[in-house]
């Protein structure tokens, strides 16, 4: 197995200036898994494994979506009760979601159980979960190349010390600019990122900046990329998870320490993947994204960067 992703699987109800959708398939493992498996197929890599929990209301059609790119869903547990549900709204420039309701349902008691055949992947991605659950995943696995961790402001607020401890166990940390400033208590983004990188003792820090792109702090080097420019902004939900899943796939391609050029290429691909997710509600754009469309957008983005 080349990539293992542990995260949430949810039904999302989302509204934005572009419209609305109810009970659409979502969650960090869903977006990350679809993106990662699309790219492992493109790159000729092995399987992407998913670990998560769903309720008895989770449909066969949605399970088929999770495995549509060949992902291994044997680590997805079905528990008695309803699947995790989230309701949110975006306004104006859609920089942040307003959470209307969160119903954890079966996710409230989720304890990750990584199947034996998935315990030694090339890359482990601990998607957005409570730090204690992320630590459990790291206890169960031994990635041969890279461990990655994504997080959010909630865990900084309610589980800061646990988060800092689990950060010290991974090779690459992904958080957004607001979370970096919050962790470091510093409004200067570069200074805050350098402080977080030091406190987390992490080799690579990737800072997501939404419509402003991404900053990566890798060793002593900094990589800065803009977002892919698009006028078709529909639903930002899942863009960060798409980004992380793509990054995991691209970094599963190499061997040994990550080189700067390798990381930059992975960040370019991750940025472009997220731009597709942005253009539809739910996972619709990830389901229809073709290799030809992706490659064309990569070429367009690289021409912008030159």
What are the functions of these language-model segments?
Residues 190-306:
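Conserved phosphate-binding/catalytic region of the ribokinase-like
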Residues 31-46, 195-199:
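A short, N-terminal amphipathic alpha-helix
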């Amino acid at each position: 197995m080349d990539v293992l992703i542990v995260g949430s699987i949810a039904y999302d109800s989302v509204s934005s200036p572009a419209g609305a959708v109810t009970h659409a398939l979502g969650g960090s493992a869903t977006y990350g898994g679809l993106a990662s498996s699309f790219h492992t197929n493109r790159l000729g890599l092995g399987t992407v494994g998913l670990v998560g929990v769903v309720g008895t209301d989770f449909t066969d059609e949605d399970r088929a979506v999770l495995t549509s790119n060949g992902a291994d869903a044997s680590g997805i547990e079905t528990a008695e009760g309803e699947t995790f549900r989230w309701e949110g709204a975006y306004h104006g420039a859609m920089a942040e979601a307003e959470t209307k309701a969160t119903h954890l349902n079966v996710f409230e008691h989720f304890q990750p159980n990584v199947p034996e055949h998935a315990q030694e992947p090339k890359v482990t991605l601990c998607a957005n979960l409570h730090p204690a659950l992320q630590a459990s995943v790291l206890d169960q696995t031994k990635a041969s190349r890279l461990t990655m961790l994504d997080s959010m402001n909630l865990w900084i607020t309610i589980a800061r010390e646990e988060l800092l401890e689990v950060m010290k166990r991974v090779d690459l940390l992904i958080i957004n600019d607001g979370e970096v400033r919050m962790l470091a208590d510093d409004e200067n983004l570069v200074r805050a990122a350098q402080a977080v990188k030091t406190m987390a003792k992490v080799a690579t820090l990737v800072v997501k900046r939404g419509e402003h792109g991404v900053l990566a702090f890798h060793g002593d080097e900094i990589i800065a990329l803009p977002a892919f420019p698009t006028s078709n902004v529909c639903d930002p939900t899942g863009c960060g998870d798409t980004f992380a899943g793509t990054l995991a796939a691209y970094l599963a391609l190499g061997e040994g320490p990550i080189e700067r050029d390798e990381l930059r290429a992975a960040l370019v691909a991750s940025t472009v993947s997220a731009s597709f997710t942005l253009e539809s509600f739910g996972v619709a754009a990830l389901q229809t994204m073709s290799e030809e469309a992706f490659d064309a957008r990569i070429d367009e983005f690289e021409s912008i960067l030159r």
